[in-house]
Each structure stands twice: as C-alpha cells, then as structure tokens.
C-alpha cells in the first residue's frame, strides 16, 4: 500500500519545504498541481523549481495545469479545476493505496496517517489553526478557545474513484440529484472519520509582500479591497496582532515546541521572519 499526498501549489516555497521535510519519510509520492493562471484568471508563470527540492525528486509527481477554464470568469471554477487536476498524477495508484488531498498549508501530522480506517469512505484530519506566522494560533473571539480546522482529507484510491469521482469532490463532497442533501448528511454521519490531533493549518504564513500577491490572485476576491490590499496595511495589522483580512478572529502567540513540525523547530532561525 502506498500513500499519495496531493495538493495544489502557487509559489509557497517555505511551506512546501516544511511539508516535504515533514512527510517525506511517511508518504510514497507527492502530487503537486500548479496552474498557468491564478484563481482570479490572470496569467502566471509556473513557479515550481525542481532544483530547490532535488532531494525529493523521486517522490514528486508534478502536474502543470495549462487548461484552466479562465473564460468562465469564475474564481471558484478555476480553483476547483486545479484541484481536480491532481487526478492526473494518480495514474500509478492501486485500489488499496491511500490518497490525501489538502491545500498546501494544511499539513497532516505524520504520526496520524495510520489512524485512517478504510471502512470509512473518508477521513478528515482535525488540525490546529495558525495565521500569518507559524506560532500565531487562532482563537474563538468569544470563548478564546483554540480554533480547529477540518483540513486534509484521506481516502483509498478505490473510494476516490467509486464514490467521490475526483479529488475536488473528495475535498468538498457535492453529489447531484434529488437526494444530494441526504447523501451529504449520510457521508458526514456514517462514512466520515474525524482524525484528532491531525496536524496543522498554517494559513497565510508568508511575508507581507507575498500576502499581497495572494490577495490579488485568490478566489476570495471580497478581500481585495483598498483598506486591506496594501503592504502598509498588512504590516501594520501584523504588528498589532489583528487579522489582516479584518475578520473577527483573536490570536495568541504560542511557544514553538515539540507540538510543531520538527523541521520548523530545528530550523527556527531560517524561519525567523515567519515566527512571532
């Protein structure tokens, strides 16, 4: 049985490095899908540089997505198409192989990969949620309890083909037909396994300049407004401990310890600009 770790990529080399170093000893292949257009439909270069990740060359299956439906002028259609393109990297998978689908910044805990039970159609890794910096944990604004994130999804290749159909539908199950709502509830209640202590969601962990680039290119164009989309505003809100996207979220700085990926802890000096 092999494990395929599948995710989309834009230009997040720091997070990609953390992900590869954290999971390389535990998965057989990384399937990386990168598109020639942003989610908002703008042309972009292919940013993945194999030379930076030469030590993982034998594990990486790279998919360049050059057929984005940008003519639809639909950011969500572009995002979904890029995620579906991960299927193109699974041609060598066998029915009993495991397939994980994530956003790049959702890193499953390597010690929890074997917690998934294939009698469930899907496993969902419940992950700790951090924003903007590796140790800037998101809190509920009312209770101040740490927020969790339903991130990485895992299934067998057989379930992926026979039940979900593709990697986008594994990520967000949207059946069709008159019974679609009942099917969603049935999956959630009886065929989805929540996997506790499931890793980390390092959302928007990048420099202010890259945050601005992401705002300009992402599907969530409601955030691309003048008060938010400037380097000055981004840096100011980071220093003040406020949410850059002006959402109702509180944060706390937590110690960088053994609860984090070992690679971040060991190389904290290299990541000093991404740590509080």
Region spans (language model):
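N-proximal low-complexity "stem/linker" segments adjacent to membrane-targeting elements
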Residues: 1-25, 266-269, 274-276
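Catalytic phosphate/metal-binding cores of nucleic-acid and nucleotide-processing enzymes, i.e., regions
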Residues: 4-6, 18, 84-96, 116-124
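Short His-Asn-centered micro-motif
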Residues: 5-10, 33-34, 101-104, 125-128
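Short, well-formed alpha-helical segments that are part of the catalytic scaffolds
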Residues: 12-32, 39-48
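Short, structured coil segments at secondary-structure junctions
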Residues: 26, 56-58, 118-119
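Active-site-proximal specificity loops/subdomain of glycosyltransferases
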Residues: 37-101, 109-113
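Conserved catalytic core of nucleotide-sugar-dependent glycosyltransferases
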Residues: 106-220, 224
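C-terminal accessory extensions appended to soluble enzyme cores
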Residues: 190-276
